[in-house]
Structures are given as structure tokens and as C-alpha cells.
A protein has these predicted regions:
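Charged/polar positions within long, soluble alpha-helices
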Residues: 20-34, 68-75
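Short, charge/polar-rich alpha-helical segments
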Residues: 1-27
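Short, charge-rich amphipathic interface segments used for partner binding and complex assembly
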Residues: 33-72
Length: 76
């Protein structure tokens, strides 16, 4: 496996881990939430006001941004 593939695999694992962490955190606050629900936390005021949830959500967004940027860079 190439180094590029190893890095993408690692990023994928980080994204999955963070998605699971975020869903668990959200469900601790609102038990019935789905993975789709947490993509729109503004629909849930309790999540929108939660600084821990927002921090973890931004961590996920950061991982996704790195992955997207890295894939674009590989195509250049």
C-alpha cells in the first residue's frame, strides 16, 4: 500500500471514530437522534448551545476538511 493510501485510511478511521463519538455525545443529550440528525445540529437547540458538542463537531469538520484537501492535492 502506498503512503498516500495509508494516510487516507488513517483519515477515514479518524473520521469514523469522531462520527461515532459525536453521535454518542449527542445521544447522551437527546437519546433518539440519528446520524442524519447530528449533521444539522441547529435543528436541536440543546446541541447548538452545547460547547462540548460544538467542539467535537468542529473536530469532525476539521478531519473532513483535511481529507478533502489531501484528496484534491493528490489529483494535482
Amino acid at each position: 500500500m502506498r503512503d498516500e493510501d495509508h494516510f487516507l485510511k488513517m483519515l477515514d478511521e479518524m473520521v469514523i471514530h469522531q462520527q461515532n463519538k459525536l453521535l454518542k455525545l449527542a445521544r447522551d443529550r437527546i437519546p433518539h437522534l440519528t446520524p442524519e440528525d447530528i449533521r444539522n445540529p441547529q435543528d436541536f437547540p440543546e446541541l447548538e448551545r452545547d460547547p462540548i458538542f460544538n467542539y467535537e463537531d468542529e473536530m469532525l469538520n476539521g478531519y473532513l476538511s483535511v481529507r478533502s484537501s489531501y484528496q484534491a492535492w493528490l489529483k494535482e
